[in-house]
Amino acid sequence: MKLLSLTTLRELARLSLPMVVSHGSFAVMVFSDRWFLAQIDSVHVAAAMGGGVAMFFCISFFIGLITYANALVAQYYGAGDFHKCSKVVTQGFLIALMSLPFLALIGYGMGQAFDHLGHDSTQVSLEQAYFYTLMLGSAFMLLKACLASYFAGIGRTQVVMITDVLAIFVNIPLSWLLIFGKFGLPELGIVGAGLGTVTATAFAIGLYLLFYLARDHRAQFSVSKSWGIEPGILRRYLRLGTPSAVESFMNTATFNLFLLMFQSYGVVQGAAMAIVFNWDMLSFIPMIGLNIGVMTLIGRFVGAGDMARANQVISSGLILSLGYTGTLATLFLIFRVDLINVFATPDEHFGEIRELASIMMLGLTTYMMADAIILICGGALRGAGDTRWIMFTSTSVHWLMLIAQYFVIVKWRAGPLVSWWVFVVMLISLAFIYAARLFRGRWRQPERLARVMQE
């Protein structure tokens, strides 16, 4: 069978485009919150970055585990075991509920850790307020992630898109009202941004449940018979999902520590990084939608035993991702100063922030296509169950980067641009390693795939 098929390309685009819109909507939600906060001052922007990343660090292990439901559901769907798809959701809900005591302990510890990171005292209090607000809604985030992964796994990505887009229309006006205290509501500042996010997440869960409990869906996927522990599915969930969870946690830990070390340069440097990562997010997060589309189709074809179609999915994913990121990188390069000025703040430091962020945007345009390769190759490998290799490789590269950052920032006290380019080189290196694994093909050996499908 030919390596590239227009039919497969269209199928991938059909599945992925709603997920691109969905994840793009999340990027818009975060982007708008930070734009609102930029109207206050640059400290609020830096604090939202620090508090938001710290929250994701705390839930990253459980998010990584729960969202592997996507690949599991896709594999069962490809094998024709529709009744097992809904059982994956139940196991995911159980995992989410069991995670709550751990999240409470981790959240308390992380909240106290802000006092010892060397940040400005004003920034610390804002980071803690935003972090604690988001952590109160962490259970909602896990349940929402499970339901979104399920609908992506069965190929109904339009449900995910509709839900997330509608959630934006709750989040953005609510955050504006609560941040600035409009129409008689209290002026909550950064806490208002957090409450807007939590409320929108709870609203999204309600929408997902409307689709999940609809009569036709209940009948096709035997939802009424899915409530209960299924030891075989749960074991497979944990066996394949735990490496993804460890990878997610460790990589988030290294990124979080890198971010916190970088912010020790000062408020100007922290705000410059926050601005650059806001634009990075608008390019990277929609690409996660394509990553999910690739993972879903690879999982489906692994379940169906059709590896020839899997090859076409990989080729199609690379064409779409490199075309998208290449175009966006060119625009970011040409208009980088104008993009930075979107986040102009009224304080006197913005000139310094703009100068540093302009140079950092060059690094962003350099690594955007590496991100595309990482996401497509990683999605294919995860969909085929090669999660242990990804865990060891990705974790090792990220921790090597962090060790290098420790020497650059703490020991040698080199400038922020040296630290930034170390980060860029790490991403480019990881892209080469992922591509080598994918195209060498050990992950597709029949005996390996047979083990992946075992319960």
Locate each region found by the language model.
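Short runs within selected transmembrane alpha-helices of multi-pass transporters and secretion channels
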Residues: 66, 70, 134-152, 160-168, ...
